[in-house]
Amino acid sequence: MQENRNIRLLILLGVSILVLMFLLYISTNTSSTSVDKQLFKVDDQTNISKVVIKPVVGEPVELHFANGKWRVNNVFDADQQMIKILFATLLQTEPRREVAASIQDSVSNHIKNTGREIQLYDGENLVKQFWVGGNNRKTETYFQMPDGVPYVVQIPGYRLYIASVFELPAIEWRDKWIFNFNWQNFKSLTATFHNQQKEDFAIAMQQTFIGISGMPEADTAKLNNYLDAVSLVQANRFIVKGELPLDSLIKAGPEFSIQITDIANRNYVLEVYL
């Protein structure tokens, strides 16, 4: 009797394991085929020459590639590192699952009330359009095609709030280099100390070497190091007009200023306030 009972238990256990394996197979197979990993991607990113990011409220961001470089709203040169991050994000982001059916409408409304509309262009041809948004805690990102349902998206292997890339204002896409020009075209640099004018100096090409005007024995190596340091100056971030109360600082005037002139006599000026 005991032996028969053990046999029945083993049979039931075997059947249970087979049923469980079958259910797991069905579940895995369904999840792997129901989500199109390429849904929000373009066939060839190298053909994309314009990216438009439209918030529901506020200034849109237009990133446009022309004459060998990316521009922001046709006003500033774009930060090349940010452009790389944008395209890496577009390339690697994939849908993980549809938002649960019970909350699809509310999530879709949330995206279209607080998110961004993304448009990718090849020349003047719109090749991809979708919406990007996130939850209030900024822990999940949603992508949604214009006539589709929202998806929870991911970059496999990372826990990121992907929507943050698309939530940046136009000023954050601006190139951070202060003196953004070809330094092979350098002509001169003038440093002006407004409260200590005796400290003023000018660096310029003098025949075949760089020197300080009025100082023939200047150390050329130190001058080159100084110019290298100036060429590498970057902004941490740009301040939007009206963001900070700077009236008193502006009225006091800059502590010093640096003006660089290139061989085409274009001037690049940096004023430093302390």
Predicted feature locations:
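Secondary-structure "cap/kink" motif recognition
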Residues: M1-L274
